[in-house]
Amino acid sequence: MMNTSSHLKAQASCPLVEHFLRRKLSKENFDRFIPNRSAMDFDFANYALTQGRKRNVDEVTSASRKAYMTQLAEAMNQNRTRILAFRNKPKALLSSNHSDPPHQQPISVKPRRYIPQNSERVLDAPGIADDFYLNLLDWGSSNVLAIALGDTVYLWDASSGSTYKLVTIDEEEGPVTSINWTQDGLDLAIGLDNSEVQLWDCVSNRQVRTLRGGHESRVGSLAWNNHILTTGGMDGKIVNNDVRIRSSIVETYLGHTEEVCGLKWSESGKKLASGGNDNVVHIWDHRSVASSNPTRQWLHRFEEHTAAVRALAWCPFQASLLATGGGVGDGKIKFWNTHTGACLNSVETGSQVCSLLWSKSERELLSSHGFTQNQLTLWKYPSMVKMAELNGHTSRVLFMAQSPDGCTVASAAGDETLRLWNVFGEPPKTTKKAASKKYTDPFAHVNHIR
């Protein structure tokens, strides 16, 4: 038997002993492996020891059956041979929003909105003029839709569904060529073929006054900016009327050489967009319209369209963004930065662009068109990918108006129908009732007709 000194000398010179002595310092290496009973699958172990290895050696099978059995065994995990478990499965890491990599964090995907392809309601509009240069439809903030049919203006209360006639214009003054609600939805301006503009209080159903002297021919476009009523005529002039004073004409914009067929004030009331039959779009700065030099009155002049521009729409989520649409021979929707005057994008639609409306809650734009499809097209902005095409009209869709909640769109066409479309979805849910905007009553100091 080896003595103690020789035994220690042998241990010191043996590399295996030295190796095992160092392994004791490691937490990853062990000299014994004891199965973890709580992690074992005893049912499978019993099956594997008793039945799992039985094979019928005389069984004759086809190649296809062998392949099937192989796939089945893999799917059912039948060929596993490991029975003992020496460690538990690692615990799942606790999620931490601030430490997880971006690709592991859950991504909120907004479900795609369902857009009905058919109009939800169709109303008759007999006698509506099929004239690209007129504006005969408007939806007020009091949820009343106004439409001009020949010499008569009708009001449809969308809340109650009732319809009534507001006024029939005398034959020598009519027909009606434009209508536009005040911002509080209580008063209506009516432009006429004889160059006059009538102002009506629709609560009491009475005429308040008549504006004369601003134009020499029909008034085809109107736009309110609080107490200022802006009118555009076939004579190419744009006139600002302060309806609070007797001599209402306060400013005249000179720039268009042909009929003004589109007028829109920005939400702030600081800029006015005008479109004309001269294929020109002007941006006017309300703070500098009184310039003594008429050739410098406009802020910007856009001449890129190749046809009349009637469709104008200010963006609700980007104050300086304006969308414009060209008529037959152009068919383009253009986007402008009205701060710099730059054209941001131009999209070919393939047909006459009659009207444009922005969604109030989504980054979407709705356009109405003429020949060949007479459709409404919903676009995703800024990609300008088509989201939907709405068909139903059999004539060019000249007029569109948006409900106060921004969800429903009314369209009117030369086919003498008025259609309602649920194109912009449901109104956004709010926890608190939004404070309504307060507008100055434009007729606060007017108590007579002139």
From Swiss-Prot:
Intracellular or extracellular location(s): Nucleus
Record pathway: Protein modification; protein ubiquitination
The keyword Nucleus is annotated on this UniProt entry: yes
WD repeat feature ranges: 129-166, 171-210, 214-251, 255-294, 304-346, 348-389, 392-431
Superkingdom, natural source: Eukaryota
GO CC term, one of those recorded: nucleus
SMART domains named in the record: WD40
BP GO terms, sorted: cell division; protein ubiquitination
Pfam families, per database record: WD40_CDC20-Fz
UniProtKB keywords: Cell cycle, Cell division, Mitosis, Nucleus, Repeat, Ubl conjugation pathway, WD repeat
GO molecular function annotation: anaphase-promoting complex binding; kinase binding; ubiquitin-protein transferase activator activity
Keyword Nucleus in annotation: yes
CDD domains: WD40 (cd00200)
Protein family according to the UniProt entry: Belongs to the WD repeat CDC20/Fizzy family.
Subunit organization: The APC/C is composed of at least 11 subunits that stay tightly associated throughout the cell cycle. Binds to GIG1 and PYM. Part of the mitotic checkpoint complex (MCC); interacts with MAD2 and BUB1.
Stated role: Component of the anaphase promoting complex/cyclosome (APC/C), a cell cycle-regulated E3 ubiquitin-protein ligase complex that controls progression through mitosis and the G1 phase of the cell cycle.
Protein name: Cell division cycle 20.5, cofactor of APC complex
Species annotation: Arabidopsis thaliana (Mouse-ear cress)
